From Swiss-Prot:
Residues 34-226 form the RrmJ-type SAM-dependent 2'-O-MTase domain. S-adenosyl-L-methionine-dependent methyltransferase that mediates mRNA cap 2'-O-ribose methylation to the 5'-cap structure of late viral transcripts. It comes from Autographa californica nuclear polyhedrosis virus. Pfam families: FtsJ (PF01728). It comes from the Viruses. GO terms for molecular function: mRNA (nucleoside-2'-O-)-methyltransferase activity. SUPFAM superfamilies: S-adenosyl-L-methionine-dependent methyltransferases. Keywords: Methyltransferase, S-adenosyl-L-methionine, Transferase. It catalyses: a 5'-end (N(7)-methyl 5'-triphosphoguanosine)-ribonucleoside in mRNA + S-adenosyl-L-methionine = a 5'-end (N(7)-methyl 5'-triphosphoguanosine)-(2'-O-methyl-ribonucleoside) in mRNA + S-adenosyl-L-homocysteine + H(+). This is Cap-specific mRNA (nucleoside-2'-O-)-methyltransferase. The active site is at K180.
């Protein structure tokens, strides 16, 4: 029922022009301008609440271009070893020069320089450089779903699964991660996330204040990677936490559409 309501509202947004939606969204949800980019602010808010980016010696930034998650983490840990992987054939995704040129930042792109985490050669290079070595892995990847918002969960499934596998390869025991997720209505999505969180002592689903409340973006924050995973069933708890954010999103989508109708 919640899924149907959300999909109907998302479809409703498509009846308005992109310019109108952007203006209404900014009016409703954007706070006064700040000098920090939104992605920086999101990780800063996550860190202030959960303290995952402090005292980091080595971290990996997955699908992180243009690099604000990496930038924030390096600002707190100026002497750390930082690794980043992002697509190089998309100008939106590449790391900006202020990140790329940092002496302690290494970009992993694979032999063909693609930076594609689905490429086995890129995965191999990541595992060689970062395997079992990272205190923190950040995974902020997403697939462009413009015009196909109701398919966002399905379109991002493979990427999120790939990121979870790389997180488990690269985190040392005791390490933490921040993983962007979207909806989890489908059985395969919730089962994938259930299997993943069993590798950690604790986990929580969170939407930072700078993440626009009408979208489906949330972050799964996992603490203290285990040497041996649990065999717990967290499906009900995952569904409960997701439902809380579905209801918040529903409320804010209604606000957005009501404003657009004026």
């Amino acid at each position: 029922m919640l899924q149907q309501k959300l999909n109907k509202l998302k479809d409703g947004l498509n009846t308005f022009s992109s310019k109108s939606v952007v203006c209404a969204r900014s009016k409703l949800f954007d706070k006064r301008p700040t000098r920090r980019p939104r992605c920086w602010r999101k990780l800063s808010e996550i860190d202030k609440k959960f303290h995952v980016c402090r005292h980091v010696d080595t971290f990996l930034d997955l699908c992180g271009g243009p690099g604000e998650f990496a930038n924030y983490t390096m600002s707190l840990n100026p002497l750390c070893k930082a690794y980043g992987v992002t697509l190089t054939n998309n100008s939106v995704c590449v790391y900006k020069p202020t990140v790329r040129k940092r002496k302690n930042f290494t970009t992993i792109t694979g032999p063909d320089k693609s930076g594609d985490v689905f490429d086995k050669n890129v995965v191999f290079e990541i595992s060689i450089k970062c395997g079992n070595a990272c205190d923190l892995v950040l995974a902020d990847g997403s697939v462009d779903v413009n015009g196909r918002e109701n398919e966002q969960e399905r379109l991002n499934f493979d990427l999120i699964m790939c990121e979870t596998q790389l997180i488990l390869i690269c985190l040392r025991p005791g390490g933490n991660c921040v993983l962007k997720v979207f909806d989890a209505f489908e059985h395969e999505t919730i089962q994938m996330l259930n299997k993943f969180v069993n590798h950690f002592e604790k986990w929580v689903l969170y939407k930072p204040p700078s993440s626009r409340p009408a979208n489906s973006e949330r972050y799964l924050i996992c603490f203290n990677k285990l040497v041996r995973p649990y065999c717990n069933n967290y499906v009900n708890e995952l569904e409960k936490q997701f439902e809380k954010y579905y209801r918040i999103q529903l409320k804010n989508l209604n606000k957005l559409i009501n404003l657009l109708k004026i």
